[in-house]
């Protein structure tokens, strides 16, 4: 099948009302980019059956001008009365629904195990087990509602998944992505790759790296960049694997240790492979570093615990920070960060530790120590503790994310240098 025009559609009145952010679309686009597909358009729709139906009809009519269209849609497959995706697709195709036996079994098991009134609960929840008749069923390994793949026209395929991010990501990787690669296998192969560049802005990256790359200027490769908290994600795509690899090598050479893979995936693998244990001592980030680690399944194998030493009494009482250190240098200082990291090593009995202490704002700053100042300690058992100073003059929530991501990067960097 020919290379498709890809459109990502998200449904949910919470999205169109601005109450929630559409993180699904960006995640899907990133995954598709890595598979060699480029999304041409994002569409966000409210929970309105008429609007959903008309938009799907409009997108289907694009097939008269495009050789092939792939629609990837999320949301509207749940048990409530405002979940209209299934209804809209069935009306557009003029078909009825059919039951997914796997989903039916999962929902029966789900309610029986929880001791609920089974028959009463099923009256509402049973809506989730149906798909348009004749569809390819996408099994849901995390939740209940299945997704489905169906044809809206001869050259228009629609893949629908639940809007819950955890369910959607697993369904995409396990079910939809393999189908996409198989269905469009006759297309020209595209290759992609990416790096995180730490403490870098999009404009600076374009000026000092992208603008000097002839292959990009000549259109032999396309590039993209997304700003994150503490880093940018720079990506490349080309029909030449050698060219993508060459661009990544140039990135690594130009930016050195600031150029990394996805450390949020790589670091857990390193810790598991090397059987390294870690812990945290956090002040200004309030446990966000610990949360980031423990968001990963299986993290208990290497993450022993975290101490949120927000008050100085916790710094002294649990981490063993000296009272004299706090009096002379203050809670936000190199000296305190060092003693926090070393105290975490002892208190938690781990191989490595991360400490962080800073001024998140909006108050608390002084002419000598401004809001945004933050110190990190990277402790290693029986080795010298490393101290790093950074300055993130951003709103409180952004500051905390910058600091948390930076602390994780600093641990990754030390482990790489210690290898």
UniProtKB/Swiss-Prot annotation:
Domain of life (superkingdom): Bacteria
The record's section on CDD domains has: cinA (cd00885)
Matching Gene3D superfamilies, A to Z?
Answer: CinA-like (3.90.950.20), MoaB/Mog-like domain (3.40.980.10)
- State the SUPFAM superfamilies in the record: CinA-like, Molybdenum cofactor biosynthesis proteins
Mind telling me which HAMAP family this protein's record contains?
CinA_B
What is the similarity comment for this entry? Belongs to the CinA family.
* Protein's recorded name: CinA-like protein
Q: Which organism is it from?
A: Leptospira borgpetersenii serovar Hardjo-bovis (strain JB197)
């Amino acid at each position: 099948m020919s290379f498709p025009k890809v459109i990502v559609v998200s449904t949910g009145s919470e999205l169109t009302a601005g109450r929630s952010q559409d993180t699904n679309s960006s995640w899907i686009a990133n995954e598709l980019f890595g598979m060699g597909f480029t999304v041409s358009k994002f569409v966000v729709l409210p929970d309105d059956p008429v609007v959903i139906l008309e938009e799907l009809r409009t997108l289907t009519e694009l097939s008269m001008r495009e050789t092939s269209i792939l629609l990837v849609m999320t949301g509207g497959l749940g048990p409530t009365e405002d979940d209209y995706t299934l209804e809209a697709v069935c009306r557009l195709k003029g078909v009825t629904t059919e039951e997914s036996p796997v989903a039916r079994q999962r929902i029966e098991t789900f309610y029986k195990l929880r001791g609920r009134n089974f028959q009463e609960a099923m009256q509402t929840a049973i809506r989730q087990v149906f798909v348009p008749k004749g569809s390819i069923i996408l099994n849901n390994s995390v939740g209940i509602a299945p997704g489905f793949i169906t044809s809206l026209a001869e050259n228009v395929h629609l893949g629908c998944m639940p809007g819950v991010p955890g369910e959607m990501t697993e369904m995409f990787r396990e079910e939809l992505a393999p189908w996409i690669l198989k269905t469009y296998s006759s297309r020209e192969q595209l290759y992609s790759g990416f790096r995180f560049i730490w403490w870098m802005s999009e404009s600076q990256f374009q000026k000092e790296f992208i603008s000097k790359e002839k292959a990009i200027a000549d259109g032999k490769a396309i590039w993209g960049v997304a700003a994150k908290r503490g880093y940018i994600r720079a990506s490349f795509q080309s029909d030449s694997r050698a060219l993508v690899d060459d661009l990544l090598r140039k990135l690594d050479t130009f930016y050195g240790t600031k150029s990394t893979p996805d450390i949020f995936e790589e670091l857990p693998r390193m810790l598991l492979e090397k059987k390294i244990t870690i812990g945290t001592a956090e002040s200004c980030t309030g446990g966000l570093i610990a949360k980031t680690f423990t968001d990963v399944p299986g993290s208990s194998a290497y993450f022993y615990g975290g101490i949120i030493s927000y008050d100085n009494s916790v710094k002294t009482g649990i981490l063993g920070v000296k009272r004299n250190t706090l009096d002379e240098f203050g809670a936000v200082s190199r000296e305190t960060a060092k003693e926090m990291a070393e105290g975490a090593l002892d208190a938690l009995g781990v191989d490595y530790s991360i400490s962080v202490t800073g001024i998140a704002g909006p108050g608390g700053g002084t002419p000598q120590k401004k809001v945004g100042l933050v110190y990190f300690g990277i402790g290693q058992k029986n080795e010298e503790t490393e101290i790093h100073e950074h300055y993130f003059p951003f709103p409180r929530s952004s500051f905390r994310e910058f600091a948390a991501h930076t602390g994780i990067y600093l641990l990754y960097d030390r482990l790489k240098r210690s290898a």
